[in-house]
Design a protein with these regions (language model features):
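Glycine-rich phosphate-binding loop plus the immediately following alpha-helix
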Residues: 115-152, 156, 164
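Single conserved hydrophobic/aromatic residue that forms the stacking wall/gate
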Residues: 177-186
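Short beta-strand-loop/turn "lid" adjacent to the catalytic site in phosphate-handling enzymes
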Residues: 23, 32-35, 50-84, 111-120
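Adenine-nucleotide phosphate-binding core of ATP-dependent small-molecule kinases
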Residues: 168-176
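Short glycine-rich, Thr/Ser-proximal phosphate-binding strand/loop in the N-terminal lobe
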Residues: 3-41, 45-48, 118, 123
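Short beta-strand scaffold segments in enzyme catalytic cores
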Residues: 16-21, 107-113
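Short glycine-aspartate micro-motif
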Residues: 4-10, 60-62, 96-101
């Protein structure tokens, strides 16, 4: 009988993530890629890579994520709501955890794990999400990792409306125009 691997596919608003676990829950494969709005193509690229690497295995799989329901239906795979999937994973692999914070491409989620499970989500505004961070990085002509490097070198903190992407973009432009010291350490 072929050995089994368990595959999880998470399709978010901007990325596709694939992870494969052994029956003993050891991570065998993990990929995180931007789908550039072509979810099916990126999912197929990652699953083809997985199939080549584990051709002699029997595979169980399920899909989660805001963009995963349609893909699950097309592929005939079970769908699990992402907050439930990540809660189960954290409770399984890190049972000492009190809080899960997830910054998605277009929303934020927080799950409290004390005295039961309390899950909350901010889906009304993209401020502080992955898409927001990407946009701010683009405005500063760096990638998301480059923002961290800029922050390490900064000599001053400038106020930016972090609750709203529109106001943050306006604040960033205004600060840059009105300050000769803006990101002087770049």
């Amino acid at each position: 009988m072929k050995p089994v691997i368990h595959v999880g596919i998470d399709v978010g608003s901007t990325t596709v993530k694939v992870a494969a676990l052994s029956p003993y829950m050891k991570l065998l494969f993990g990929r995180y890629e931007r789908h550039m709005s072509d979810i099916r193509h990126m999912a197929m690229v990652l699953l083809h890579e997985l199939r080549e690497k584990f051709s002699g295995y029997r595979i169980t799989a399920s899909i989660s994520g805001s963009g995963g329901m349609g893909l699950a239906k097309v592929m005939g795979l079970p769908f699990c709501q992402e907050i439930l999937a990540e809660t189960k994973a954290v409770q399984t692999f890190h049972p000492e955890t009190d809080v899960i914070i997830e910054l998605g491409g277009e929303d934020e989620k927080i799950t409290y794990l004390q005295n039961g499970v309390d899950q909350r989500m901010n889906g009304a505004c993209a401020g502080g999400t992955g898409a927001f961070i990407d946009r701010m990085a683009s405005l500063l002509s760096v990638d998301a990792a480059g923002m961290g490097k800029l922050a390490e070198k900064a000599e001053r903190i400038y106020p930016i409306a972090s609750r709203c992407g529109v106001f943050a973009k306006t604040d960033r432009k205004s600060t840059r125009l009105n300050s000769s010291h803006y990101f002087e350490s770049r």
